[in-house]
């Protein structure tokens, strides 16, 4: 065979081999082209799942212990005999409860002279008094007309059925229960809500369409929160 013929044959064989190699690479090339789209789909799925989990967390109420229908005789708290008395139970390290205090501030701005208000700050036994004096303690102290009490071991909270941070009870001047529940629309969210609206109506008009609402906040009696750590993540009720 002439050199020219051998050259043509080599070129033909090279072309065939190259085509075969390209054909064998096609599946992997197609796979790699799908990777960006697959990653985008997985990312969107993860974001959607995260949003659903967050929405469920924010909208799931805590447990609500029943408040006594009459002012508890064993309590050391003073009931006002000339106007309504409000008692709010707070876990001092519950971040959700900032919203509860924000709503309480709105209530007091509208009806401070019509209601006597006390906020109980839970403190487990074995810790110094400063354990409960967090930013929530300071926020409550900045609301005109609000008294603060350190509730050692949650004795008073239990007397009023308070098991979730933010739980609020309202009694009239005769010691009869008018309202019990939370005053936020979800965990950590301020804004118009049935609880605050009902309280304002009860305090100003002595009548309301709502007397019980859900409470959104951390469990008051949670052993996991009883540490010196200033950070406490709100948990869903068990």
Can you annotate each of these PLM segments?
Residues 98-141, 152-159:
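Structural microenvironment flanking redox-active thiols in thiol-disulfide oxidoreductases
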Residues 80-104, 199:
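Short active-site neighborhood of thiol/selenol oxidoreductases, capturing the structured segment around
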Residues 136-171, 177-178:
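Short, internal strand/loop/helix patches
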Residues 36-52:
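Hydrophobic membrane-insertion alpha-helices, especially the h-region
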Residues 178, 182-238:
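Thiol-/selenol-based redox modules, centered on thioredoxin-like
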Residues 91-101, 125-129, 168, 216-238:
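Short, thiol/selenol-centered motifs that function as redox-active sites or metal-ligating centers
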Residues 66-84, 103-106:
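A short beta-strand-turn-helix
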